[in-house]
Amino acid sequence: MSQQELPLFATSHQAQRGAVEIEPGAIWIPSWLGDREQIELVAACREWAKPPAGMRRPHMVDGSPFSTMSVCLGWHWYPYKYSRTCDDHDGAPVKAFPPILTDLGARACADTGFEATPFDAAIINYYAPGAKLGLHRDGSEGDDVIGRGSPVVTISLGDTCTFRLGNNRTRNRPHHDVQLASGDLLVFGGPARGAYHGVPRTDPGTGPAYLTLDGRLSVTLRESGQVEP
């Protein structure tokens, strides 16, 4: 069965009112989280960032550092693999995937027209002012997960960013730039699951004052495709 035949991604009229289809398989919902939910999620991120298995700066396989910092839940990700321990940091067991993210993942799928997805890995990225993330594809989840078009959920908190969603073939154009503000939701899967994407810039000082957050947090949920040994 081809990816197009899979009933994973529903047609855009089944998504929540206010949802914007950036391209087939990529849905953006502005102001998806209310003020109280954003405050609660930022507070949770601050707890998850504490050691052990806390926030760290990842490095590429060549040793070059990311400009973002991150903490993982459920499964620890580092280029380009998953582990139950923070192998590139303090070696501690990764924190459990929490119920709050299970609930948000289910709601995100329902509101964007995707089928329910068994999310089991989260990456919380922190963008200090000036941080960015180069164009890349999420490919560590394995052929089955990617081939099914299992969606990736991203919740934006704090400063507004430019999120660049490219194509499945190359880092070059065509691409779409979306201004993700605090509380916005972006989900991409189905035919967009293999798209290159990144964050070429953030806009310092644009986040809501009530979050007391200097910079931006992105909370990204994935189906890892991992099986316990």
Residue map of PLM features:
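Non-heme Fe(II) oxygenase metal-center motifs and adjacent flexible, charged/small-residue loops
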Residues: 1-229
